[in-house]
Amino acid sequence: PSRGLGDVYKRQQEILLTPHFYAHFDKISSFLERREYSFRKLTKALNEHDMGTPLSLRKGAEVYYFPGIGDAKQIRELTIEGTDILLLEMPFAQWTDEIYVDVKKLIEKQKLTILLAHVERYDSFQKSRKIWNQIFKLPLYAQINTGGIDRHKKKRFIKKFLKLQVPLVLGSDCHNMKTRLPNLKQGRDSLRDIFGETLLAAIDKTEERLLK
């Protein structure tokens, strides 16, 4: 890893590794094989560098919604390691009754803990709020990415979303060290400055509870 990546790792205690999974062009078995190969490469590189405090890495996936996911038998294999948490990326379109039923099945039939990825990205697609409101009444969790929290549009969204009283966690949306860098610290600082320490403390407690 680069010096920058090492510096980032030294500031973290645990990192969730959640590569994208798209059921319309991938098989779970193939995805898991590639993920394991990448994970071994990563851990080998970490072992070859002085990364300071030992870091906990958990494998997972960011699973893009597909019709029928609520009944998918192997879906549990994509949960975050050591948990029953499924990080679910929702459609970038108007949400429908079918989507609601699938999410409900994941919770009630599959007995999974659903964490909806980067919820701020779906807001503009919801011309009707009916299904949006129904989904966020389900016992699930929502993730907000830390990038751009100080921008007006995102601040406005967070303020509105907080009224739904859905438990929140934060994500860095880190994809690389050039264009989509780790930004968790900056995002946390912005969140604290704008919304106060109480919200940040509540988020920390939610994250701790989910990953215990």
Which residue stretches match the model-derived regions?
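Single conserved hydrophobic/aromatic residue that forms the stacking wall/gate
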Residues: 1-9
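Short acidic/polar active-site loop segments enriched in Thr and Asp
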Residues: 13-14, 112, 168
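Extended substrate/RNA-proximal surfaces in nucleic-acid metabolism proteins
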Residues: 26-143
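Active-site metal-binding loops of divalent metal-dependent hydrolases
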Residues: 20-21, 62-63, 119, 147-148, ...
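Short acidic/histidine-rich active-site segments
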Residues: 18-20, 166-182
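Short beta-strand segments at enzyme active-site cores
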Residues: 13-20, 58-60
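Mid-to-C-terminal alpha-helical segments outside catalytic/metal-binding sites
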Residues: 184, 188-212
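Histidine/acidic-residue-rich catalytic or RNA/ligand-binding cores of hydrolases
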Residues: 126-133, 152-164, 178-190
